[in-house]
Amino acid sequence: MPTLNMEKKNFIFKDLELKNTLVVPIIRSNMTDTATTRTQWDGTVTPANGETEDNLFNESHDWQFELRNKFNLKYTLGRHTFNLNDQFVFSDYRPKDDRMNEYLGFDPSSFPSKMTSNNIGLSYLFASSNNRFQNSLTISIYYLKSKIYRTSDALSKDKTESVFAPKQTNVNKTYYGFSEGLSYELWKGVRGKISFSHNVRIPDTGELFGNGMSIKPSVNLQPEVGDNLNIGVIMDKRNLLGLTRVQWETNFYYMYMKNMIRLFPADIRSIYINLGKTSTLGFDTDLKVDITPNVYAYFNLTLQDIRDRQKWLNDEKGSDNPTYDKHVPNIPSFYYNYGMEYHVEGLLGKTELSRVYVDVSHVGEFDWGWQMSTLPDQRKKWIIPSNDVFTIGLQQSFWHNNVSLSFEVENIFDKENYMEFKMPLQGRTFKAKLRFNLFRDKVSGGAMSM
């Protein structure tokens, strides 16, 4: 993936910092499904057109070209900091499947989907002379232009010609956002904070275009627009109770969102759609402890209640919404993870780094569909059971930290676990990763960092 980074201090004039990152992903995805038979669970072999449930042959060779650019200008004047940030994305998705011509009646490669988005924000940060009081104000403008051809939907005839063509959806809108945050150091190393924001999240290309297989292109997908309130406490103490360093952050938050983007079933596939109105009331806490300079432990936990707040099926008071005030499915309400690692420098060489770690994650049970019944048998049908995943691993650097080698065993007890939509997670899994720092870039921390 071609990437170009550029950084410059004192750009144009003193104290003006420039950072720019340009990434050009080029993605080729292929799916070949030409199976003529299907084997059932009991061993019975039946005729089929492909293995997927839509009973259609697939031989796709899709291309996706993207251009992503992040631009940032930062200027500091005494206790005042000004920051201009721009994030631009252009994506061109070109599906191609010759077998589709046989049952769709058109060549999907003639109908590329495109998306252009831009997010520009200007922020102002003020810090008092002793940094005890800090204030941050940001104003943002968001732009989204998308043209999506729903090549997996039913065909519609062109109004001007007697030919079949895929349905098309267009979005061309501009949005605004802002955020205001205050923090104050209550005691040395302990800071309280409060923030309010009106944010917009532009859908990404995977949500808009689908994946050409199990996820369909989205229909009139709109950006998420949310109002957020956050109140929290941050602590950062060194040499506390004999510990090298203790970092702790906890937050209480409330979010009211319009057009929340979620993945839902659509016929035999899935599609990203907008939920009209939702609310989130939550709490999270994150604890990091350097027990000694070489031993590190952590724990984080999240509790959240996300509910549908669309009382009517449309903006006019007509039909009641049957899912009103119910939990939004496929989002866990309770999860946590904790772990510990031992890291050391110089064990296998003067500048080499070594790490051994263990990680445990827990996700409480949650529903994978709207819970419409109070009957125990029906509720059990839609519940994804809680799961625990234990992971151990080690990492070692070589060649003056320009090469790192890591091994990891995930789900070491080989437990049966499920994710969203009750899709099974992998059992015991062995992973290995080799990383190179070919240009010996010290700014990135080498091939491995603590």
Residues of each region from the PLM?
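Extracellular loop and loop/strand-boundary signature of outer-membrane beta-barrel proteins
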Residues: 1, 5, 52-60, 101-112, ...
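Outer-membrane beta-barrel channels and translocator barrels
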Residues: 9-13, 76-80, 117, 127-133, ...
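Outer-membrane beta-barrel translocator domains and adjoining extracellular loop/strand segments
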Residues: 1, 30-48, 94-103, 147-156, ...
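Gram-negative outer-membrane beta-barrel transporters
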Residues: 79, 247-256, 273-368
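Membrane-embedded beta-barrel scaffold of Gram-negative outer-membrane proteins
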Residues: 185, 192-197, 223-281, 302, ...
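Face-selective signature of the C-terminal outer-membrane beta-barrel domain
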Residues: 1-161, 174-177, 183-187, 195-197, ...
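Conserved C-terminal beta-signal and adjacent last beta-strands/turns
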Residues: 123-125, 180-185, 194, 224-230, ...
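Transmembrane beta-strands of outer-membrane beta-barrel pores
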Residues: 24-30, 77-79, 88-94, 126-130, ...
